[in-house]
């Protein structure tokens, strides 16, 4: 996916540059989505739709008079990391907006209840993306979202994979944001940017979205039963775990600026997300197994070695790639555990 970035110079003219980001735009089987039978949990979906329509955060994303001034007070050593966070987050939110909006449009006639839920979530994602993009604009930089929408590239995922992935993504987002907010409440001296003041309410949007996908999965038990689906659940749980941990364990990271220990923060978020997912999934990862933590740390170390070999020949990288693949396989082979006593998502 190519993102057009706009950067204003000291005069009134703008220069444009482009940066290549990893594709994060998805499409799916809309006909299969339209045929979902949610009648067994219709009351739960209607209750959640009522929450969506209440739009509790309608007035939340309003910048106060001191927002820009505080944004410009950021320590120069953290500015690049903050911009990276804003760009990555904005891209992710905009991706969600496009997917949810398209699903809502396609389901409007065949499955109006689901369509209305997706419409409300697309509203939230658009609001988040716009807020993040405006924060980038404080540094004379921002994503050209209209151009991005035209140039987007799609990766096809089956509906059940969309459900697994978005459920975990929204729940991880919730636990990430609330953990950061609570930490900065205790240590306000580490609040390097005013954006973090908004995380307490913001994370509730993420939580409601996660609850919605949890309801979909609970309403379609065939997506959670059987050995093949159980393997897919393990795959997605481990993929999200690895992606987060490997990214957060990089030496120069935003969490240092916030006064957080990146490894401890990542594990706490993963532990909470893992337990939360047990309300929906038939199994969870055994994060308390000492071997799991050892293998996870080993993967993070090997990933850093691999990045250090960037630009080297494939032959030079092969031993590290093989070691990383082997360690990931060992993680996958660790026996999962049963979730805590089952609860309804809502």
Swiss-Prot record:
Pathway: Porphyrin-containing compound metabolism; chlorophyll biosynthesis (light-independent). Its EC number is 1.14.13.81. Keywords: Chlorophyll biosynthesis, Iron, Metal-binding, NADP, Oxidoreductase, Photosynthesis. The keyword NADP applies. It catalyses: Mg-protoporphyrin IX 13-monomethyl ester + 3 NADPH + 3 O2 + 2 H(+) = 3,8-divinyl protochlorophyllide a + 3 NADP(+) + 5 H2O. Pfam families: Rubrerythrin (PF02915). It comes from the Bacteria. InterPro entries: AcsF, Ferritin-like_SF, Rr_diiron-bd_dom. PANTHER family: MAGNESIUM-PROTOPORPHYRIN IX MONOMETHYL ESTER [OXIDATIVE] CYCLASE, CHLOROPLASTIC (PTHR31053:SF2). Belongs to the AcsF family. HAMAP family: AcsF. This is Magnesium-protoporphyrin IX monomethyl ester [oxidative] cyclase. It comes from Gloeobacter violaceus (strain ATCC 29082 / PCC 7421).
